[in-house]
Amino acid sequence: ATAQLLRLAGPDDRVGVVAFDEDVQLVLPLSRHDPDTAANEVLALRSGGSTNMSGGWLKALELLAGGRRPEALRRVILLTDGHANVGITEPDEMVAFVRGAQAQGVTTSCIGFADGYDEHLLAALADAGMGNDYWCDGPDQATRVFADEFGGLASVVAQNVSVEVRSSARVAAAAVLNEFPVTEVPGGFQVAMGDAYGGERRKLVGPV
């Protein structure tokens, strides 16, 4: 599945690949790669017995932090068919790391394979990372999932959009009913809405 993802990358895209089981392995550094050569590197991998999900994600974050293109979209795409059972395994702790990275401009999308992965954890990580959450049943579906993910990246028109809401003196209290992260600021609050895509409409909903 990862080999298919690599073939969807454009000529200007830089992609890195990290593999994780009980250990974490850098397969491809963050760079432009020949799709066939990169795919062969990925296809040579063999699965292990455990899932160090946090270690893999943190290594990917390290790759992105070393990038030298500040204007680039930075996204971790986490693929797994298992449960986090090595490294950081507490869901709230993992979510906090992903949310912190999102505040620094790194989004996280998650793709779970088959029926053995932790769907609740991946959904929480994708929400915290302002990314997408997918379920993938096999190679045929993987092509569509990856096309959706890369198509979304290509249509990003603004990153890390936030809206600041300030109420008038006549308003006793204000709130947001959406599940966007909210931060209090003097005189109101700031709503983090993630990346904005061309042609997309976003709504903020509050009580009346």
Residue positions per predicted region:
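Exposed acidic/Ser/Thr-rich ligand/metal-binding surfaces
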Residues: 1-162
